[in-house]
Design a protein with these regions (language model features):
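Second-shell loop/turn segments in exported
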Residues: 39-41, 115-123, 203-210
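A small/polar (G/S/T-enriched), proline-flanked helix-loop surface module common
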Residues: 66-179, 239-240
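Long, compositionally biased interface segments
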Residues: 204-250
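Sec-exported extracytoplasmic/periplasmic mature domains
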Residues: 50, 60, 124-127, 137-140, ...
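Secretory targeting and sorting signals
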Residues: 1-30
Length: 250
């Protein structure tokens, strides 16, 4: 059996789940509206994302069209095995409209091992709270979940709550499974920065250490804090926001 193609597809499916749990994709089901004022812009969010310079040598940025959240074809088959998490992922895999400031990135190591995804979304504080609460509840409810990458291969992962980096209050889980004897491991976490939500995913094969995942998570958190002028876990809006447009008096 040739492993790289199905392994990469399964990795993409698993990390698509991480992005789909982010508030950008939960917001995709919301009623369309105008871009919110007083929130960071998509450009400001993009500047806060990890780059190849942040994660270390050997990584390359995946083309935007190959992003795990680029559309339904990027996640060709639903996940199953945990109703709350599966329903949340399968219901919210669409790309949100322009009224939702967002940015995301996929960084691949050699041969797609490891893979890192990060998405940032800005939205109203109350809506963000509801979206992150839903994602956290879904993560906590799972013990196993199965990913099918659209090939003949599927993997059932055990799901274990973990702490990523130094953020003990941030919801995160570890996923462990095997495919044809190859060990697969992933970490998925969500984080809040005032009115910005982050979804983080890390996938590796033939390895189970959490050290690199935590290192990349710390790097992601630190960069968002620096770029947006905010603190992880805070409900205070970032200092980096779009200018408020004032109407003309008549």
């Amino acid at each position: 059996m040739s492993h790289p193609k199905p392994l990469h597809a399964l990795a993409a499916a698993a990390l698509a789940a991480a992005v789909a749990l982010g508030p950008a994709h939960l917001a995709a089901a919301a009623t369309p509206g105008q871009p919110a004022q007083g929130l960071p812009t998509s450009e400001q969010l993009a500047a806060a994302l990890l780059t190849v310079d942040d994660v270390g040598p050997g990584f390359a940025q995946a083309p935007a069209t190959a992003s795990p959240s680029a559309g339904p074809s990027a996640m060709p088959s639903p996940v199953n095995g945990c109703d709350a998490l599966s329903d949340l992922i399968n219901m919210h895999t669409g790309v949100p409209g322009p009224e939702t400031p967002r940015a995301e990135v996929e960084l691949d190591g050699q041969g797609g091992n490891p893979m890192v995804t990060e998405s940032l979304t800005a939205e109203d504080a109350g809506k963000l709270t509801a979206d992150l609460d839903a994602a956290a509840a879904a993560l906590k409810s799972c013990h196993t979940i199965t990913f099918n990458a659209g090939t003949n291969d599927s993997v059932t992962f055990t799901v274990t709550p973990v702490t990523l980096g130094d953020r003990q209050d941030a919801p995160a889980v570890r996923l462990d499974g095997t495919l044809a004897g190859v060990q697969l491991n992933a970490f998925v976490g969500v984080e809040r920065f005032g009115t910005v939500g982050m979804a983080f995913g890390f996938f590796q094969r033939d390895g189970a250490s959490s050290q690199l995942a935590s290192f990349q998570y710390r790097a992601a958190v630190a960069k968002v804090q620096r770029a947006l002028g905010t603190t992880a876990g805070s409900t205070t809006p970032p200092t980096a926001t779009a200018p408020v447009t004032r109407g003309t008096s008549v």
